[in-house]
Amino acid sequence: MILFVRDLTVIDAAYLCPHRGVVGESWLVDIELTGELNEMSMLFDFAKVKKQLKSIIDAEVDHRLLLPQKAPETLIEQAAPGYVFVDFLSEDHTIHLHCPEQAFAVIPASEITPETVTAYLLTLISNQLPGNIDGLKITLRHEHIPTPSYH
């Protein structure tokens, strides 16, 4: 059985790029769950899917600065309790931040891409799904805008 949710939410976030500095991004999120029907003959209650998965995504990456933890340009240090120092040192940009921990999502990757954010979300969400769910697919995509836009 497959349950597909198109446009579950929109991730509005920023990330650090060694060439462009701080870059804003918006991704539409689609989710596909596969598995066996439960005792109520449902894969997963549709209302719960939307609420639970959207809340995880919103809490973890929406309206945050996404940090590429494994990038050679990134240095993350604990500051005072609840605060973090971030230094991002590239040939083109030097960025120094001192912010509350909740301002960031630390992505275990060398760069921020839809694929690395998807892998991060798969890890977070997979642990929160009921036992009858055996497959999870997440797609991050840009909204098609037929008029000129800047990215």
What are these regions (language model features)?
Residues 1-151:
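Charge-rich, low-complexity N-terminal segments
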